[in-house]
């Protein structure tokens, strides 16, 4: 069976800091290609959103991922924060669409479950597991670790989906 190497970009959107993590995945193995944070300037929101879109698009053009994964919006008590997060997420989705990149979405609970094995894991636990799973020299910053965790979650989830489809095909 052929297991091609796939490149996945994970995106953890934020209006001030957007984390990104780019991994390769082949079969049950994954490795880190790049990770970091897009720290927006202290401009008005529209300029920050444009910066997020532009920098993510540049990363996509440089690293040529096959797929993207992003965290779903979760419920906030502060409506303004939720709105800004949704707008940052929209800027990230525009960048992926501009590069014709398919996008998968995962809840925070799904991501933590896939990476830590516990859906209510702390940020520190996610950082630690990303550090271990990708054999990084040191733990990445929280936003980048979250983005790498999103990419790892997608690698695992999509691999399991492929196996289920193959098994279903053998049953019919």
Curated annotation (Swiss-Prot):
E.C. number(s) listed in UniProt: 3.1.21.10
Keyword Transport: no
Co-factor requirement: Mg(2+)
Active site: 12, 71, 143
Subunit description: Homodimer which binds Holliday junction (HJ) DNA. The HJ becomes 2-fold symmetrical on binding to RuvC with unstacked arms; it has a different conformation from HJ DNA in complex with RuvA. In the full resolvosome a probable DNA-RuvA(4)-RuvB(12)-RuvC(2) complex forms which resolves the HJ.
Subcellular location as annotated: Cytoplasm
Function: The RuvA-RuvB-RuvC complex processes Holliday junction (HJ) DNA during genetic recombination and DNA repair. Endonuclease that resolves HJ intermediates. Cleaves cruciform DNA by making single-stranded nicks across the HJ at symmetrical positions within the homologous arms, yielding a 5'-phosphate and a 3'-hydroxyl group; requires a central core of homology in the junction. The consensus cleavage sequence is 5'-(A/T)TT(C/G)-3'. Cleavage occurs on the 3'-side of the TT dinucleotide at the point of strand exchange.
Pfam families: RuvC
Name of this chain's protein: Crossover junction endodeoxyribonuclease RuvC
Residues given in the record as Mg(2+) 1 binding sites: 12, 143
Keyword DNA repair: yes
Swiss-Prot/TrEMBL keywords: Cytoplasm, DNA damage, DNA recombination, DNA repair, DNA-binding, Endonuclease, Hydrolase, Magnesium, Metal-binding, Nuclease
Organism: Coxiella burnetii (strain Dugway 5J108-111)
Catalytic activity, as annotated: Endonucleolytic cleavage at a junction such as a reciprocal single-stranded crossover between two homologous DNA duplexes (Holliday junction)
InterPro entries, per database record: RNaseH-like_sf, RNaseH_sf, X-over_junc_endoDNase_Mg_BS, X-over_junc_endoDNase_RuvC
GO terms classed as biological process: DNA recombination; DNA repair
Cofactor: record remark: Binds 2 Mg(2+) ion per subunit.
């Amino acid at each position: 069976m052929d297991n091609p190497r796939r490149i996945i970009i994970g995106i953890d959107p934020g209006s001030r800091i957007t984390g990104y993590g780019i991994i390769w995945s082949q079969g049950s193995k994954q490795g880190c290609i790049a990770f970091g944070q897009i720290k927006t300037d202290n401009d008005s929101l529209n300029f920050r959103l444009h910066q997020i879109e532009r920098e993510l698009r540049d990363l996509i053009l440089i690293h040529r991922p096959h797929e993207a994964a992003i965290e779903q919006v979760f419920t906030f008590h502060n409506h303004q924060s939720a709105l800004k997060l949704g707008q940052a997420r929209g800027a990230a989705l525009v960048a992926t669409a501009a590069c014709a990149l398919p996008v998968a979405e995962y809840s925070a609970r799904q991501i933590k479950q896939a990476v830590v094995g516990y859906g209510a894991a702390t940020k520190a636990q996610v950082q630690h597991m990303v550090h271990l799973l990708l054999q990084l020299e040191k733990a990445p910053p929280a936003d980048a670790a979250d983005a790498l965790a999103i990419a790892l979650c997608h690698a695992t989830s999509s691999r399991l989906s492929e196996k289920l489809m193959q098994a279903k095909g053998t049953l019919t």
